Amino acid sequence: MSNSHHTSQGRRNKLSVWVKKIINTTTTTNASVSSSKPRRGTRAGPTRVKRAELDPDGTTISSSLRPLVDRNSLHSSESDDEGDRRVAWDEPPTGKVRQQQQQQQQQQNDNASVIPLVSFCSSSVKSSTFSDIHSIQSTRPTIFSNRTFETNSSVLAIPPQSILDRSRTLPPSNASNTTTRRP
C-alpha cells in the first residue's frame, strides 16, 4: 500500500509541475497584456489614443484603437455634403425616351428568348404523358413466384396456402359474434 501511495504522489508532483508551467505562462502573458493597457487613473490616456490614431507613422496601434473608417473617405464625405445634389428625374427626358424606344425595337426583333420557352413547354407536355404511361405500367407486377410477389418498388411476401386455408376454416371468435349481433 505504501508503494502505490508513493507512485501516486509522484504522479501528482509531475502533474503539478506540468500544471504550474501552464499557469506560469498564462500569468506572464496576462501580466504583459495588462501592463500594455492604459491605466484609468491617468489623464494622458485619451490624448495618447488620439495621437496614435492621427499619427501616420504609428505602426504599433492595437486593433481596438485603429479607426474603422479610412481618412480619405472621411474627407470625401465632407466634400460631398458641401456639393450640390440633383434628383435623378431632374434630367431632361428626351435622352431617356430615345433609349427606351431603341430597347423596345431590339426586343421586338429578338426572338431568341421566346424559342426556349416554346420548346420547353412542348417537351414538358410530352414528358408528362410519357411518364404517366410508364407509371401505370410500373404498378403492375413483373415477376410471380410461389411465395413472393415482386413489383418494381418492393417485394411482398405471400403467405403459403395452408395458412390461408386455416384462416378460412376457423370458426368465428366470440368477439366478432358479440359485435355483429343485433337486438
Swiss-Prot record:
- Regions of biased composition (Polar residues) lie at 170-183
- The location annotated for the cross-link Glycyl lysine isopeptide (Lys-Gly) (interchain with G-Cter in ubiquitin) is 21
Q: Where is the composition biased (Low complexity)?
A: 99-108
Q: Which GO terms describe its cellular component?
A: cytoplasm
The yes or no answer to whether the keyword Chaperone is present is no
Which taxonomic lineage is given here? Eukaryota, Fungi, Dikarya, Ascomycota, Saccharomycotina
Name the chain's protein: Uncharacterized protein YKR045C
Q: Where in the cell is it found?
A: Cytoplasm
Source organism of the structure: Saccharomyces cerevisiae (strain ATCC 204508 / S288c) (Baker's yeast)
The segment annotated Disordered runs over 24-111, 160-183
Q: Which UniProt keywords apply?
A: Cytoplasm, Isopeptide bond, Ubl conjugation
